[in-house]
């Protein structure tokens, strides 16, 4: 299972995450620019499943800012039944 790591020392706002996500998965520019589009990509057939997504350098005080992203990946992990693993590390 390949691990894709997103370093929140380098990600300040949600738009930065979308840009890094597009780059990491070699998606078409502009294919993810909001949570709905991200959900469609993650739960659709556009990612090389199975995979693990890891958020690093995301302390508790920043988790509120990125709470919607965390919730989306938590829900996608359930939806994809073992094909996606998601972890958050400080």
Positions of the model-derived regions?
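N-terminal intrinsically disordered, low-complexity segments enriched in P/E/S/T
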Residues: 1-30, 43-90
């Amino acid at each position: 299972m390949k691990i894709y790591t997103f370093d929140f020392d380098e990600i300040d706002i949600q738009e930065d995450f979308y840009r890094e996500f597009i780059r990491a998965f070699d998606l078409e520019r502009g294919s993810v620019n909001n949570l709905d589009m991200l959900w469609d990509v993650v739960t659709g057939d556009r990612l090389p499943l199975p995979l693990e997504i890891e958020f690093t350098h995301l302390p508790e005080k920043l988790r509120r800012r990125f709470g919607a992203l965390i919730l989306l990946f938590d829900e996608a992990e359930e939806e994809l039944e073992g094909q996606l693993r998601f972890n958050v590390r400080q």
